[in-house]
Amino acid sequence: MMPIFSNRGKKKIVLPLLQYVYEQLYSMNFRDYCFVVGREKRSIEDHFAPHETYLRDLEGNYKKTMKQFYEKLDKSHLVWINQNKPLGFGDAVKRSERYVVTEDFIVHAGDVTILSKNRHPVLRLMDVAENNPDVKAILLCKKVKDLKRYGVPTIKKLSKDLFSVQEVIEKPDKPKSEFGILPLYYFKSEIFSSLKKIKLGKGKEF
């Protein structure tokens, strides 16, 4: 629920980052959402539950923004899943299996926002999936300086902007490429069988 400044009307207003991410995805016609959350679940779930009394007490641009947010929520289907222990991103994805079943799906960490001057990265991932139907997982990568903060892929170049991933090492001491993986993914449901095979990694996380 970290804040982000958003220009709505003539004034800047502060929105929770997760709301901004949700509204980005909503603008791309996503309507089904599965939130995997830990201890802070209550504040997140409360924010995503329309509250008419709260709305009546608001004023100006913020009231208009929240009213539009609630209208979007009313047209969305939200599911909440608990992650009782902080076992990492892989564990969070694995917990969504009963909701996803056999569908292709997007995973967004929700604690960062990814901006683009051109086509949004989510849509670019979907483009790659449509053009490569046999690919089971698509990752978004970027050249970064501090590679020890990222998952780092070993890659083989296929085209200007497309690479085949051979392996991924989380926060490596000796990185094998100059790319870090950003927290935005496109998966087919086969990812769940792969997640069940991996063991705890660095920091005792999946």
Residue ranges and their predicted role:
Residues E40-K41, K143-D146, P172:
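Glycine-rich beta-alpha junction loops
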Residues I4, P153-K157, F187-K188:
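Short beta-strand-to-turn element immediately C-terminal to the catalytic PLP-Schiff-base lysine
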Residues G9-I13, L158-F163:
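Short, solvent-exposed loop/turn segments that connect beta-strands within catalytic domains
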Residues Y54-R56, Y62-Y150, I155-K157, K196-I198:
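Conserved beta-loop-beta/alpha segment of the NTase-like Rossmann-fold superfamily
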Residues K41-R42, P86, R119, K188, ...:
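Alpha-helix N-cap/helix-start and coil->helix boundary motif
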Residues M1-E59, K63-K64, R119-H120:
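N-terminal glycine-rich phosphate-binding loop and ensuing alpha1 helix
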Residues V122-L123, E130, S159-F206:
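Catalytic-core segments of class I nucleotidyltransferases/pyrophosphorylases
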